[in-house]
């Protein structure tokens, strides 16, 4: 597990909104999105999941996420019957945790990220947070990066 701080440029993504318990809606959404990309023969370069609600504050059946693909610049998209939309992820300062998630313990990784952010003199910004998947999870483990927009804490240098 390693933490770094990175200034990232804006990034275009093609995403699909899913609603429901994250452990169920995100994998289901990715199945649909990947099937759509294969039908369209789209050469994606990254897979991401954006989380919009805090599970400790929002009912499980109302949790919102976007599953997303990054496509090479200039990729033409054919018929869009799935409702995939193009969005731009804002750039800025991010805390980035590179880790391996075992036994589906994604929440543990997020908690570790927030602890490390505070220990390094930063706080989560009211921006964006997402997971970038660096493998397909077929081994039962997920190599991921968790990106959280951050601001310096007052008094931090």
UniProtKB/Swiss-Prot annotation:
It is found in: Cytoplasm. Its main location: cytoplasm. GO terms for cellular component: cytoplasm. The keyword Electron transport does not apply. Coiled coil: none annotated. Keywords: Cytoplasm, Stress response. Pfam families: GyrI-like. GO terms for molecular function: DNA topoisomerase type II (double strand cut, ATP-hydrolyzing) inhibitor activity. The keyword DNA-binding does not apply. HAMAP family: DNA_gyrase_inhibitor (MF_01896). PANTHER family: DNA GYRASE INHIBITOR, TRANSCRIPTIONAL REGULATOR YGIV-RELATED. Inhibits the supercoiling activity of DNA gyrase. Acts by inhibiting DNA gyrase at an early step, prior to (or at the step of) binding of DNA by the gyrase. It protects cells against toxins that target DNA gyrase, by inhibiting activity of these toxins and reducing the formation of lethal double-strand breaks in the cell. Interacts with DNA gyrase. Belongs to the DNA gyrase inhibitor family. This is DNA gyrase inhibitor 2. The gene is sbmC2.
């Amino acid at each position: 597990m390693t933490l770094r701080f990175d200034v990232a440029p804006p990034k275009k993504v093609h995403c699909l909104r899913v609603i429901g318990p994250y452990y169920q809606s995100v994998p289901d959404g990715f199945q649909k999105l990947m099937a759509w990309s294969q039908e369209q023969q789209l050469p994606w370069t990254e897979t991401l999941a954006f989380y919009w609600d805090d599970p400790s504050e929002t009912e499980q059946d109302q949790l919102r996420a976007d599953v997303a693909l990054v496509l090479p610049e200039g990729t033409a998209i054919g018929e869009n019957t799935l409702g995939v939309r193009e969005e731009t992820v804002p750039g800025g300062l991010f805390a980035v945790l590179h880790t391996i998630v075992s036994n589906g313990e994604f929440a543990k990784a997020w908690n570790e990220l927030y602890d490390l952010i505070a220990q390094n003199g930063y706080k989560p910004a009211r921006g964006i947070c997402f997971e970038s998947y660096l493998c397909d999870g077929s081994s039962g483990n997920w190599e991921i990066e968790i990106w959280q927009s951050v601001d310096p804490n007052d008094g931090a240098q």
